[in-house]
Amino acid sequence: MILFGSTGSIGVNALKLAALKNIPISALACGDNIALLNEQIARFKPKFVAIKDSKNKHLVKHDRVFIGQEGLEQILTECQDKLLFNAIVGFAGLKSTLKAKELGKNIALANKESLVVAGSFLKGVKFLPVDSEHAALKFLLEGKKNIAKLYITASGGAFYRYKIKDLNQVSVKDALKHPNWNMGAKITIDSATMANKLFEIIEAYHLYDFKEIDALIEPRSLVHAMCEFKNGASTAYFSKADMKLAISDAIFEKQDTPILEAVDFSKMPALKFHPISTKKYPIFKLKNTFLKEPNLGVIINAANEVGVYNFLENKSGFLDIAKCIFKALDHFGVPKISSIEEVFEYDFKTREYLRS
C-alpha cells in the first residue's frame, strides 16, 4: 500500500490497521510532521518517502526522500503497489488521485475533494471509500435493486446545540470540539458548517451514480446511512463512531477481523433523526443545486478552503465561511468545465478573487 497523508488522523489509523494485518507499506508521504514520519519509517520501513518542503529533507531518516507534488507523482510511477490510500486534505490531494487513475491503481479515498471538484473526470476508477457514510452505503447497496432514496447522517457538528444567534461569537477552539468524532481541524470545521455533509452527498452521487440522496441529523452518530426501497422497506447501517471501521473496509480483503465493539441494541438510547436547518447551516441550501450542477464543486470547495483557513487563522468569523462560498458563487455562477485543466483554472481564480 502507498499511503499519502500518513501523519494525519486518518493516516495514523490506517497504519494501525495495516499493522494488524501485516499489510506492507511501500511508501509514506506527509506534510511537516517529520518527527511522527520518522517513527513511521522506523516501524514500517517503506521504500519511498515524500514530504512537502525540501527544507526538512535533512531531518528525514530515509535514503529516498521525494519532495512536493512532483515527488508524490514520482513515487506513484516508481512504486508497483496497486493501492493508493489518499488521505491528503483538500484540493491538494487531487493531482495524486488523477495520477493514480492514469497508472491504473485502485484508490482508497479519504480525499473527498477529488470527487467533489473533479468527479466527472474520475469515471472508471476503482474507489474504496474511506468515509463512514460511504462505506455504509456500499454495504447497504451491495446486490440491491429498486432503490428509491439514500440517506447519510450528520451529527450536527460542534454547534448542534447552539442557538443561531450565538454562532457569530464562537471561537476556533469551540468549533474544534466535535461531539462524536476525533478528526483533523479542517474536517471538524466542515462538520460544524455542514460543508462536509454537502460534499459527502456529491461524493455519494459520483461513487454510486444516484441523485436521490439526502442527509439527516442523527446526533449520536450510531446510524451512518440508510437505504429506502421502492416497496417502502428501508435498511440502516449501525456502528459506533470510529473511522477505523471504514478504513478497514477499504484496505482489508476480508471483513473478518473484530475492529469495533458492536452496538448493543438492548442498551442503545432512543434515536432521533432531524432535518438539517438551512438557517443554521446555510451551506446546505446548495444541496439540490449542487446535485444538478456538479461543476459548482470546484468553486464551492475553493471558497470553503479559503473561508476555513481564514477562520482557523482568526482572520474572520465562523459565519464568514458560508458568506465566502456564496460570494464566490455569486461572482462565478455555474462554470462550464470541459477539461481537467479548467478545474485547476477555476480553483486558482476562485482563490485569487476571494483574496483580492
UniProtKB/Swiss-Prot annotation:
NCBIfam families noted in UniProt: Dxr
The EC number(s) this enzyme carries: 1.1.1.267
Tell me which species this is from.
Campylobacter jejuni subsp. jejuni serotype O:6 (strain 81116 / NCTC 11828)
What processes in GO biological process is this protein linked to?
isopentenyl diphosphate biosynthetic process, methylerythritol 4-phosphate pathway involved in terpenoid biosynthetic process
The UniProt annotation places NADPH binding at T7, G8, S9, I10, G31, N33, N111, E113, G184
Name of the protein described by the UniProt record: 1-deoxy-D-xylulose 5-phosphate reductoisomerase
Q: Which residues bind 1-deoxy-D-xylulose 5-phosphate?
A: K112, S132, E133, S155, H178, S191, N196, K197, E200
* InterPro entries linked: DXP_reductoisomerase, DXP_reductoisomerase_C, DXP_reductoisomerase_N, DXPR_C, DXPR_C_sf, NAD(P)-bd_dom_sf
This protein's source sits in the domain of life called: Bacteria
The yes or no answer to whether the keyword Chaperone is present is no
Gene Ontology MF terms in the entry: 1-deoxy-D-xylulose-5-phosphate reductoisomerase activity; manganese ion binding; NADPH binding
Q: Which UniProt keywords apply?
A: Isoprene biosynthesis, Manganese, Metal-binding, NADP, Oxidoreductase
What reactions does this protein catalyze? 2-C-methyl-D-erythritol 4-phosphate + NADP(+) = 1-deoxy-D-xylulose 5-phosphate + NADPH + H(+)
User: Which pathway is this protein engaged in?
Assistant: Isoprenoid biosynthesis; isopentenyl diphosphate biosynthesis via DXP pathway; isopentenyl diphosphate from 1-deoxy-D-xylulose 5-phosphate: step 1/6
